[in-house]
């Protein structure tokens, strides 16, 4: 196991969260979301699960943070392509959306998973 030193400052905590996000994203991209566990994430980081729990409570929390990051990147891409224009011809509209998806290939996967996760983990 890697030498683990608990982050104390806000800056170090942000670095730890970024490490968690990167490791989780790698694991989510390599296989099924449902096959990834906090144990797998901790192992990928070289940490114990107890150390991981100091920063996150659930796998869903990590996933939703990644999803929001992907969503923000996708929306920013769309806004950049629209460049403040409101009246865009249909053909250009389709082209803008197609290019935005091409530049953000992971976003649709995360969006689909997000709906599945919410349906599975939220009771009405």
Features from the language model and the residues they span:
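Long, hydrophobic, well-ordered secondary-structure blocks that form the structural core
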Residues: 54, 64-75, 80-84
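Amphipathic alpha-helical segments used for helix-helix packing
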Residues: 103-123
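Generic hydrophobic, amphipathic alpha-helix propensity
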Residues: 13-24, 41, 66-70, 74
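Hydrophobic alpha-helical connector segments
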Residues: 65, 80-107
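N-terminal intrinsically disordered/low-complexity leader segments
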Residues: 1-15
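Helix-turn-helix
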Residues: 19, 27, 33-61, 65
